[in-house]
Amino acid sequence: PMGAIGFIGISYLSFRAIQIIIEIYDGSIKSIKPLDMIYFILFFPSLSSGPIDRSRRFEEEINTAIPRQVYIDEYLLPGFKKIAMGLLYKFAIATVLHMFWVSKVKPDVGILPIINYMYAYTLYLFFDFAGYSYLAVGTSYIFGVHAPDNFDKPFLSKDMKEFWTRWHISLSRWFGDYLFSRFVLDSMRKKRFKKRA
């Protein structure tokens, strides 16, 4: 298990490092402050499972003085609320779902057991992962960093496209900004997609 956790942490570290390299390459990052970059890449609250922040936004925030009352109202109190929500999701709801639903599903081959397990595990995965994300974001707030939220009521989505934009938001936006959009723009410049006659 620790090996898997370590691998996940390395993957999120890689997302941050790749983002910096891409933005240096395309000129979005004009100057580099090594200590700020290292702090961004190794920022511990969100290191193991996100959310994936953006280096320029992160650097701007850590270098901006926060007035005491603003910190209390916009960072400290919201941070504790998010941590409380994370504890509720991860250690109460997810635990109950696993103990009394996921672990009780019989490993029978059949459509009903499969559907039952699918719903049980999906809900468990959401509350477990969203709970961790709330803990990470809340801790980030307390450290003076408005880390992005990772979930936005995904089960209220009208279709799979909307679901993808509400589930693990920071990861889907990362892929959109640093892989998909760049691939499309590069393909248009090189005319990879030719119009059919």
Residue ranges and their predicted role:
Residues 1-197:
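Membrane-embedded transmembrane alpha-helical bundles that form the catalytic cores
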